[in-house]
């Protein structure tokens, strides 16, 4: 970890400033867009449906990722981690919970959309609430395991944020990684791809699918794939042989996912977009109520 007034190994002054600035921009953009999405759900009755509850879960998870990025950005600009080892464990846990919840919520939204548009039965509240509860409980379970000894949280190469420690590459890390990745990356990615593919096949014959069926899977793959590749490399070789700057790239890419998700799921939905606009325009909302 970089101490106060010193630069992390492998980074120059401008590089540390650049990483901190990028993280800050990603954090603020992700927070602002996802908080607006959450407010639109709370204040717009039309959005209080089981299907939109899944999108709300995704927005909450992405807000958590952005908060995690904000802490990392602040520490990067300070050029040190000011919260101690316990703060590092808490930061790693919170970031891992929200990352897994975001990935699994994306899969839940994909399944919910397929269920809504391609089946005759509507998604009910019991199913939606149970699904959201399962996503968050499962994410908390997997994120807690490194705190209990299966896996480990440690500082990232910049020394100003914390994540799953991949530098050891031992049997403990390898067994945790492959098990966790199957249930929390490969399986959600499979559900997302299959759900939207089935939507294209069923709805494409008669009309254009009402939602973007390509971007969600690409976001999962491109947003979290670099982390998966880095972790996979760490199981077969010494990850420290990769330059510290290159090791930070997956983190910077992943922190952009909340902004992309908000633009796709919220701003890309006419109803959610209308709800956000009503939150930003109180007079318009009052006028709509009078009508």
Swiss-Prot record:
Disulfide bonds join 88-162. Covalently binds all-trans- and 11-cis-retinal. GO terms for molecular function: G protein-coupled photoreceptor activity. Glycans are attached at residue 172. Pfam families: 7tm_1. The modification N6-(retinylidene)lysine is found at residue 255. One of its GO terms (cellular component) is plasma membrane. The lineage of its organism: Eukaryota, Metazoa, Chordata, Craniata, Vertebrata. Residues 1-15, 74-91, 152-175, 241-247 are extracellular. Preferentially expressed at high levels in the retinal pigment epithelium (RPE) and Mueller cells of the neural retina. It comes from the Eukaryota. This is RPE-retinal G protein-coupled receptor. It is a multi-pass membrane protein.
